[in-house]
Curated annotation (Swiss-Prot):
Family matches, as Gene3D superfamilies: 3.40.50.360, Ribonuclease Z/Hydroxyacylglutathione hydrolase-like (3.60.15.10)
Cofactor binding: number and manner: Binds 1 FMN per subunit. Binds 2 iron ions per subunit.
Function summary: Catalyzes the four-electron reduction of molecular oxygen to water. In fact, functions as the terminal component of an NADH oxidase (NADH:O(2) oxidoreductase) when using NADH:rubredoxin oxidoreductase (NROR) and rubredoxin (Rd) as electron transport intermediaries between NADH and FDP. Is thus able to reductively scavenge intracellular dioxygen and is part of an oxidative stress defense system in C.acetobutylicum, an obligate anaerobic bacterium.
Claim: Plastid is one of the keywords in the record: no
Domain notes: Consists of an N-terminal non-heme diiron domain and a C-terminal flavodoxin-like domain.
Induction line: Up-regulated upon exposure to O(2) (at mRNA and protein levels). Repressed by PerR.
Binding site for Fe cation 1: 79, 81, 145, 164
Protein name: Flavo-diiron protein FprA1
Length: 392
């Protein structure tokens, strides 16, 4: 791989990771990915974002193929996640006089990544840089998808460098200008759902900031650049970032059961909540896809999670659910745990602790009962429901 010219003075100097199959532990990347870095070779030289550690030698070779022995004057850091900043410490050693241009938050994070001194400029204070024939304007875009994020606009070429926004884990076989085949759009949507969907409000705010810019190219930090599909890509992001219309108040109940006892209570809780005027639905966890569970929780006003206690713990399917829930989306919602036990009953309080750590609003205690629930336990459950509904 080598540098690729995008237009006069502007080059892609990123790297391709065609063998990547899992990103950030949580994403499947069957089409690989790219770590995009861009270089403006003008009177002054600017690099926009770097690449993941492990690809530095290839990255530096691409840089030098464009600028030779010229120095780099500016390193623009739009976002400090390690796939974009992992090689920063080596690049700064190569070009120690370069000024690092970033948001204040990014500068703070970089100090803990580079662990060395570097020259820096606050992008929001300088607002723009004149490189000679090219000007870079900086646009704050916080929480897309980190607090430090910003966009960079090359005014003369009408190129918007968007960091992760409108990016995609998709490694083209040829040019970085190749916009992909039929399999590209599903990967772009998957990327949005996993990375950007918790920040829909900020997606809309970011799109509002760029709506009046003339755009001939959108250059994200992953995947191909957008040239012929700019309008469509922006439109899709608007569509995907729409907040759902408020639904009827509802409680979603998810449970796992060993001998049926936690299931009996799950169904009783569902019936009682419905009787008291709030819509409730009950689901056996192992009958569902995780993405469907996550979506139901995101659309719910309240969540109940049930598990028996086995070997002093709740069982794994419940922990799988509780490790898939996004606190950014669900904080402040009502949630509680319930379940049957035989010996000591640690499962329910352990689930309650997890719900609290996810920023759910919880009652003081969950609902736990020994073995098979009967009239006494159902009466306690009805009081539990009253308290829970009060949190909605």
């Amino acid at each position: 791989m080598s540098a690729e010219k995008l237009c006069e003075n502007v080059y892609w100097v990123g790297v391709k990771d065609q063998k990547l199959r899992v990103f950030d532990i949580i994403m499947n990347t069957k089409k690989g990915s790219t770590y995009n870095s861009y270089l403006i070779n003008d009177d002054k030289v600017a690099i926009i974002d770097t690449v993941k550690d492990g690809f530095y030698d290839e990255f530096l070779k691409s840089i030098k193929s464009v600028i030779g022995d010229k120095k780099v004057d500016y390193i623009v850091v739009q976002h400090t996640e390690l796939d974009h900043s992992g090689s920063m410490y080596r690049l700064i050693k190569e070009y120690p006089e370069a000024k690092v241009v970033s948001s204040k938050a990014a500068n703070m994070y970089l100090k803990e990544i580079v662990n060395d001194e570097f020259n820096s400029l606050d992008a929001m204070e300088v607002k723009e840089l004149n490189l000679g024939k090219n000007t870079l304007e900086f646009i704050s875009a916080p929480n897309l998808h980190w607090p430090d994020t910003m966009f960079t606009y090359n005014k003369e070429n009408n190129i918007l460098f968007t960091c992760d926004v409108m990016g995609c884990h998709y490694c083209p076989d040829g040019s970085i200008k190749d916009e992909g085949g039929e399999d590209y759009l599903p990967e772009m949507r998957y990327y949005f759902d996993v990375i950007m969907s918790p920040f829909k409000k900020f997606v809309n705010m970011g799109l509002d900031k760029i709506k009046d810019l003339k755009l001939d190219m959108i250059a994200p930090s992953h995947g191909p650049v957008h040239i012929n599909d700019i309008e469509e890509s922006v439109k899709l992001y608007r569509e995907w970032a729409k907040e759902k219309e408020p639904k009827e108040k509802n409680v979603q109940i998810f449970y796992i059961t060993a001998y049926g006892n936690t299931g009996i209570m799950a169904k009783h809780l569902c019936e009682d909540i419905n009787k008291k005027g709030v819509k409730a639905e009950v689901h056996e966890i192992t009958d569902m896809k995780m993405e469907d569970i996550v979506e139901l929780i995101a659309d719910a006003n309240g969540v109940l999670v049930g598990s028996p206690t086995i070997n002093q713990d709740a069982v794994r399917p419940v922990w799988d659910v509780l490790s898939s829930v996004c606190p950014i989306v669900n904080r402040g919602k009502a949630a509680a745990a319930f379940g049957s036990y035989g010996w000591s009953g640690e499962g329910v309080p352990m689930m309650m602790d997890r719900l609290k750590s996810l920023k759910f609003k919880t009652p003081d205690n969950g609902l736990k009962f020994k073995f098979v629930p009967a009239s006494k336990e159902f009466s306690e459950a009805d009081k539990f429901v009253d308290d829970f509904i009060g949190l909605l």
